[in-house]
Amino acid sequence: MKDKIIGKGTWLDKVANSLIIREKKLGRSLDLIKVESGLGASGIPHIGSTGDAVRAYGIGLALNNLGFKSELITYSDDMDGLRKIPTGFPLWLDDYIAKPVSTIPDPFGNCHKSYGEHMSSLLLESLDKVGIKFNYRSASDVYKSGILAREIDCILSNNELLGKKIFNLVSQDKYIDVLPYFPVCNNCGRLYVARAEKYLSNERKVLYSCSGSKIGTKKISGCGHKGESDISKGEGKLAWKVEFAARWKALDIRFEAYGKDIMDSVRVNDWVSTSLLNFPHPLHVKYEMFLDKRGKKISKSAGNVLTPQMWLKYGTPASILLLLFKRISGTRHIGLDDIPTLMDEYDYYEDIYFDKIKENNNSKKIKLKGIYEYVNKLNPPYNTLKHIPYRILVQQASFFTGEGRSDNIFLRLKKYGLVEEKTDDLINKIS
């Protein structure tokens, strides 16, 4: 018996269908299904950061295709403290280690209000360029507005139970003795260095002492201040082990993918969400991390970042979307030299879609056509144009510079019989 084709036959459709089945069993409203992507704000966003948001958006598209409304929430973790200076950043940032990135000056001038806003803007800019629609939320605004106050209160009021459960789940004993909350010391302005010692539930305040902490390999001294942190005014933040759960419930999130590097945090957050906050945790998909060509993890702070901006300098938005939509499983080694292959692969998918290339395997054909439609955000073009191998375009582009460059390249391609007319698509690829 052949497997039933769901939606457009892609992994996006399978996940969306599983999500709908799960939500119906839970009896939750399906009027608007929110999917989420967390955005790190501590360093330059890389292609993997973009991937998390793009895939979540893809699930939203698949939900739309199945007849349901969806919304992508992009959540910037700009309350996180700066743990180290990313490669190539100004050394004066050393004075701001452990301070929330939303309170650190913009290291690249005055174009943004803070370090965190600058880093977040780079990722949001890339999402705009590839045509992703989203609702942006920043952690600093969410905490300051008190949106998470009810969830924080529930979590801190159950800290003894929570500390034991975290130890049972991931063998971490830290939160048996310490509250899973990082106050911002109101004297030195740092996170992580102030030890949360007691929660006053009636006042919704955390008592702390700024005693210092080890961040990575660096010991950060505390200033000795003793104070209190109001959980409803953004004077601190939850630890990652419990923070996801709080925002899932507060923002009504139904889907969020995650990388295997934070698997332990997700396990704990799932329990917190379901068992403490009485909000069945979102459906998840686990993805492997992107690696560079040497097999090293692409890192915001290690200096081997492949950014979406770098990619879009040479490739089209469609090439990024194809990279991220065609599959989710397996580790991939990526670099700029993959762009020509993906550009030509997109043309192949387009030829399959318009039946210029025959594919005898029907399920494969449906899947390839489905991926093409999702790359085009369910609004594919009405017809296809003649394709030019991308490496030939790159070669021709290297021959011509200056004024009239596009015209000269077009004339050369026309001479070779590769094009008949100058189109917007051709000009975009040349430029």
Question: How should these model regions be labeled?
Answer:
Residues 132-302, 308:
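Active-site cores that bind ATP or allylic diphosphates and position pyrophosphate for catalysis
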Residues 64, 128, 156:
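Anion (oxyanion) recognition and catalysis
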Residues 1-88, 243-265:
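N-terminal catalytic cores of NTP/NDP-binding nucleotidyl/phosphoryl-transfer enzymes
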Residues 92-130:
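A glycine-rich helix N-cap at a beta->alpha junction
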Residues 41-44, 79-83, 144-145, 290-297, ...:
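Flexible loop/turn segments at secondary-structure boundaries
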Residues 261, 266, 287-431:
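Catalytic adenosine-cofactor/nucleotide-binding cores of aminoacyl-tRNA synthetases and other
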Residues 46, 155, 316:
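Residue-level signal for inorganic ion chemistry
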Residues 80-96, 151-152, 156, 297, ...:
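Charged, often glycine-rich, active-site loop that binds/positions anionic groups
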